A protein has these predicted regions:
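N-terminal anchoring/stem segment of glycosyltransferases
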Residues: 1-59, 178, 246-276
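Short, highly selective alpha-helical patches that border small-molecule cofactor pockets
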Residues: 18, 22, 118-120, 184
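A structural signal for short, well-ordered beta-strand segments and their strand-loop junctions
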Residues: 35-38, 81-84, 89, 106-109, ...
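Short loop segments at secondary-structure junctions
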Residues: 41, 75-77, 145-149
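A glycosyltransferase accessory/donor-loop signature
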Residues: 46-51, 129-141, 145-276
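Conserved phosphate/oxyanion-binding catalytic-loop motifs
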Residues: 62
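GT-A fold catalytic core of metal-dependent nucleotide-sugar glycosyltransferases
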Residues: 67-118
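A short, conserved beta-to-alpha structural element at the edge of catalytic cores
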Residues: 107-130, 269-273
Length: 276
């Protein structure tokens, strides 16, 4: 039984972020297998596998998450957790894996939190919940296996990712269509269209900290982005704090400026130390 994590990255910033994420996974999940999914030809010590995309996309790709539909075919693992590259993992997933494998073909979180562990309202997805009766689903961390049900999900996801503008134009009123690709909405559409249950039995399963939604919900101080008004600290034993709050979950930080050499070195060096 093979299980592992898949991270997508193509640009230089994404590749740096993916390496940080891989190191964080291996610190908290020592025997974890981590795969980099990319269009590039490269080698990197942080990854156990490096896989290239199976399919070329003729459509304009402005967000790597438009390639989510390829994950089923590209993952080298029987059981996969896919995580957005702009994330760090600060928790063990032993119990999570056991739950997911035993209960789901595909599973997406239904709740995201702020760095204080408060559940976020998510004003953007809430309008689709209110107007179109969609149950919220989040796509920055989700699980799938190689079953027929999972294949059904990714086949459905394919045209949504490729032609998301037409999809939103067909499904939603004009004022509810987005100008930018919004991965959470695409996965929400797919999740609510399945004949099988993709939602976890507990809201805490797969839940993660989403600093982008915390920012857009307006619960943080004003600024260009959350890093302009909040401090982040890492240590040489790969701990992480935002303000005075220790991060002990999956953190989706969203902003490219989160990544810096100090954080990257702290996590890389600590992973190498504990694996000696």
């Amino acid at each position: 039984m093979s299980r592992g994590y898949v991270i997508q990255a193509d640009t230089d910033p994404e590749l740096y972020q993916a390496e940080l994420l891989a190191n964080s996974i291996k610190i908290k999940n020592k025997n974890a297998q981590v795969c980099l999914l990319t269009s590039r030809n490269l080698e990197a010590d942080a990854f156990d596998d490096i896989v290239k995309y199976e399919f070329f996309m003729h459509e304009e790709v402005v967000d790597i998450r438009q390639k989510d539909w390829q994950l089923y075919w590209c993952s080298p693992y029987e059981y996969t957790i896919a995580i957005d590259c702009k994330s760090v993992v600060m928790e063990s997933h032993d119990n999570l894996w056991e739950y997911l494998i035993d209960n789901h073909s595909v599973c997406l979180p239904t709740v995201v939190k702020d760095f204080r562990n408060n559940t976020l309202v998510d004003k953007q997805l809430s309008k689709y919940e209110q107007e179109y009766k969609y149950k919220k689903a989040y796509g920055n961390c989700f699980y799938f296996d190689k079953s027929e049900e999972s294949l059904e999900y990714f086949k459905f996801l394919d045209p949504l990712c490729r032609d998301w503008r037409s999809t939103e134009g067909f499904l939603f009123q004009k004022q509810h269509a987005n100008k930018k690709y919004y991965s959470n909405l695409i996965h929400t559409i797919a999740a609510n269209s399945m004949r099988f249950d993709v939602f976890p039995t507990s809201n805490d399963m797969l839940s993660y900290i989403d600093m982008d939604i915390a920012w857009s919900d307006g619960i943080l101080p004003d600024g260009e982005n959350w890093l302009d008004v909040m401090s982040v600290w890492s240590t040489d034993i790969a701990t992480l704090k935002i303000q005075n709050y220790s991060i002990n979950n999956i953190l989706y930080y969203h902003e490219d400026s989160f990544y810096n050499n100090e954080i990257a070195d702290d996590f890389r060096n600590y992973r190498e130390t504990i694996n000696k």
